[in-house]
């Protein structure tokens, strides 16, 4: 059976952003089916809209199903995994610039603050997420302006993720940080799927 990878963009993201097209092409060249769905209303993301959108894109999840999340896409993937029926396991996930604990440096605009509170204030059962996720990797940058490094704690301690800290990659964004290739993400997907 073909291994499938679903890439979830972040807040204000889109499928052609940054390193997503490169990663899609790299993994397809190695025999994976890769999907990068446009999550609805990316400028004002909502859990109750994004999670069902991921579920619809995935269909039936199994051990041949892998995920890559970027920023808020990591939360969306984890919250999707939380909804899976008991006993269902996926192959693994690579989280890039993910967070459960806190964000930093956000604008004071009310809509930005409200979106931040929506995602960080809505409880998530990471033990349930872990029950569906046997293997994961969480990648951070030492100079991310929005995702402080203490976010790694939940990934390591509650999800059992391997932690990787990259140097000077910012938020791993295409526009702001000019990241159009991310070999560490490709390599970790290949390792998880190995």
Model regions and ranges:
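Active-site catalytic motif of lipid deacylating hydrolases and related acyltransferases
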Residues: 2-63
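Short beta-strand/loop motif that positions the catalytic acidic residue
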Residues: 132-133, 137-140, 144
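Catalytic active-site module of serine/aspartate enzymes centered on a nucleophile-bearing elbow/loop
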Residues: 177-194
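Gly/Ala-rich beta-loop-alpha elbow adjacent to hydrolase catalytic centers
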Residues: 67-77
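Conserved alpha/beta-hydrolase "acid-adjacent" motif
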Residues: 145-151
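Active-site nucleophile loop of the alpha/beta-hydrolase fold
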Residues: 10, 39-42, 93-103
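Catalytic histidine neighborhood in serine/cysteine hydrolases
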Residues: 31-35, 157-174
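Catalytic histidine-centered segment of alpha/beta-hydrolase-like enzymes
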Residues: 45, 169-182
